[in-house]
Curated annotation (Swiss-Prot):
Disulfide bonds: none annotated. This is Large ribosomal subunit protein uL15. Gene3D superfamilies: 3.100.10.10. Part of the 50S ribosomal subunit. GO terms for cellular component: cytosolic large ribosomal subunit. Pfam families: Ribosomal_L27A.
Length: 149
């Protein structure tokens, strides 16, 4: 009975691993044109991957983008009055820290309260910004709004 094959005994089959042919190293071994054929751009240099063979390139066919990206754009996290009703139905004072602990917003980012939904709880809320409808609904429910910077 022969011994089992072990990992360190494995070798590639004879002729399976051929050395890479080094071209352009003399006339006898793929010298001169080195497998590139004769003449033309591809024989002389590397053609750019973006080259489309004389067709108008894609970056020139597409329209230019208008406008710019405003570096001073402020993106607000949104909280609706329906969320306030759901999480703070007893009313009271609500700050951004309370909204963070309730899982409605993330810390260190501005918060805007919008007027989607209904609110009956009397909340005194402090946030970065309020929409006009949110202010109206909160004040109609007996609460107050305070805008921070």
């Amino acid at each position: 009975m022969s011994e089992p094959i072990k990992l360190h005994d494995l070798r590639p089959a004879k002729g399976a691993n051929k050395p890479k042919t080094r071209v352009g190293r003399g006339e006898a071994s793929k010298g001169k044109t080195a497998g590139r054929g004769t003449k033309g751009t591809k024989a002389r240099k590397q053609v750019s991957a973006a080259f489309e063979g004389g067709q108008m390139p894609i970056h020139m066919r597409l329209p230019k983008l208008k406008g710019f990206k405003n570096p001073n754009k402020v993106t607000y996290q949104v909280v609706n009055v329906a969320d306030l009703q759901k999480h703070f139905e007893n009313g009271g004072n609500v700050t951004i820290a309370d909204l963070v602990s309730a899982g409605l917003v993330r810390a260190k980012q501005p918060v805007k309260v919008l007027g989607d939904g209904e609110i009956t709880a009397s909340v005194n809320i402090t946030a970065t910004k309020f929409s006009a409808s949110a202010k109206q609904k909160i004040e109609a429910a007996g609460g107050s709004v305070t805008e921070t910077k």
